[in-house]
């Protein structure tokens, strides 16, 4: 199941026997999860219209997971001393699948600041230590998608014949700041085509290195963040963009 994702370009990384746990204890859930993720697509027009944010992009994926009973859940933990609650803390996870063998926790990090990975991994670590979850799963932008954004968005702009701010406004892509517009105008004044100037500024602002994407997640896991929780990490490849 995971091998099929690997063969079609998805970044897949597992830690602490997660792959064996999923295959043995959650084969049906893993199969359905892989199927939903393999079929997921993101429109470049949606990416640009939405200013790079989540909006409707990953909401479709969230709805599909919810339909499969991967629901938002708030884990509540209390410390009890001599029968009296002394302290309490909660851990909210966007998608949790409860099964007979245990629970799977999943977070989608499309385009947050990269410290959100620390939050997710540390949450998984604590929940696993409490035997509340069996595996933690994170889905984010893969390496090939991250590398392809500039070329793909530039090509889309050219294909749409977009060559001015007025044409962007016509498509409803006019909610950018004055500073962003000026940066594009300055590049155009230096001779850069409008589509190229817009794409460079857009990608730098929205999908920069300080946002959630594969290399940032991989780096944290290689350093041991989240250990010893079993982890499955999935990076969406360029082919998801249409």
Where are the regions that the model predicts?
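Active-site metal-binding core of divalent-cation-utilizing nuclease and nuclease-like domains
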Residues: 47-51, 60-101, 115-122
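Short, flexible loop/turn elements at secondary-structure junctions
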Residues: 97-99, 110-112, 237
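Hydrophobic, Leu/Ile/Phe/Ala-enriched alpha-helical segments that form helix-helix packing faces
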Residues: 61-69, 128, 214-225
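Catalytic cores of nucleic-acid endonucleases
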Residues: 111-173, 196-212
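Non-catalytic C-terminal interaction segments of nucleic acid-processing enzymes
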Residues: 1-30, 158-242
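N-terminal, charge-rich interaction modules
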Residues: 1-65
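Structural motif
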Residues: 102-104, 135
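Glycine-rich active-site/cofactor-binding loop and its immediate structural neighborhood
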Residues: 95, 105-108
């Amino acid at each position: 199941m995971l091998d099929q994702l690997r063969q079609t370009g998805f970044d897949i990384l597992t830690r602490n026997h997660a792959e064996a746990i999923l295959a043995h204890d959650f084969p049906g859930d893993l199969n359905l999860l892989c199927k939903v993720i393999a079929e997921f697509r993101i429109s470049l027009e949606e990416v640009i219209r939405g200013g790079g944010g989540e909006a409707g992009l990953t909401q479709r994926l969230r709805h599909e997971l919810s339909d499969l009973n991967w629901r938002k859940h708030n884990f509540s933990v209390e410390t009890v001393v001599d029968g009296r609650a002394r302290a309490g803390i909660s851990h909210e996870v966007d998608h949790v699948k409860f099964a007979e063998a245990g629970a799977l926790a999943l977070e989608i990090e499309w385009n947050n600041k990269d410290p959100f990975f620390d939050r997710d991994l540390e949450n998984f670590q604590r929940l696993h230590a409490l035997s509340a979850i069996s595996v933690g799963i994170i889905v984010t932008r893969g390496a090939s998608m991250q590398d392809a954004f500039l070329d793909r968005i530039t090509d889309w702009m050219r294909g749409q014949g977009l060559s001015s701010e007025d044409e962007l406004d016509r498509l409803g892509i006019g909610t950018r700041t004055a500073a962003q517009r000026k940066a594009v105008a300055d590049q155009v004044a230096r001779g850069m085509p409008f589509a190229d100037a817009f794409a460079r500024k857009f990608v730098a602002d929205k999908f920069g290195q300080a946002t959630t994407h594969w290399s940032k997640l991989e780096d944290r896991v290689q350093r041991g963040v989240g250990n010893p929780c079993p982890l499955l990490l999935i990076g969406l490849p360029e082919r998801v963009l249409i």
